[in-house]
């Protein structure tokens, strides 16, 4: 081979090698940083898809007494319309667990539990099996009692805190009812989320008969907030106010508006961090039924739930 041909051949080989090296260094199209990694790696055939669940907390005023004369027909139709997957109830007066289950069956819930069958009990109804973990009654100083249950892999705590301004049996001065509620909430927290800190999914709801610092923008100066501050320090988030800057009242309704009570929020759904990040909607339900059949408005949330217990 002639000398100039050899030189030309070597030059072409060097140029081709440079092109090959450049091609190796260039990113592939599939590695475009604008495309999220999960879109590249997720297998639609095996990925876990969440279900959407709805939960309502409702104080039904002494066993839904305003609809008892109609055999609870209006209440049943309302629940069917809202279609919660499970529902916490305060003031299930005069219900037994058997009769509450029968009522729940009418609106599509096959399961129900009641904390007791006297006084002002709390209850829980569900489309899905309820694992009752504890009835909080005489073993802790709770005025109305509480329920700790599990639905799917979600811990659900239903409570109704002490309703009066002074200690039971007239003990103590005005305002000491706050101290009793503080005692109740600490007993409930000690028996539930503090006792099982490694369990990530918690909802705690009910009539707290007390005020949250989250509502300080709508409350008078000097309002007592410690009951809810204790809850917030225990790993719970306010499902309503942590998603909305606006104040919403849960009392009074039209039923008792003439009493002259100022708008207040005493009905809450609290969520642990693992639950809070999956909530897609939270609201107080204002409609014709809720305005006229109880002295409290119900609270509702919707959330994503991963069957694997994500």
Task: Annotate the PLM regions.
Residues 2, 25-103, 307-310:
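N-terminal, active-site-proximal structural segment of metallo-dependent hydrolase catalytic domains
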Residues 2-17:
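Bacterial N-terminal signal peptides that target proteins for export
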Residues 53-60, 78-97, 156, 181-218, ...:
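Active-site beta-strand/loop signature of hydrolases that rely on acidic residues for catalysis
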Residues 57-73, 162-180:
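Acidic/histidine-rich helix-loop elements
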Residues 86-166:
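Structured beta-strand-rich core segments of catalytic domains in phosphoester-bond hydrolases
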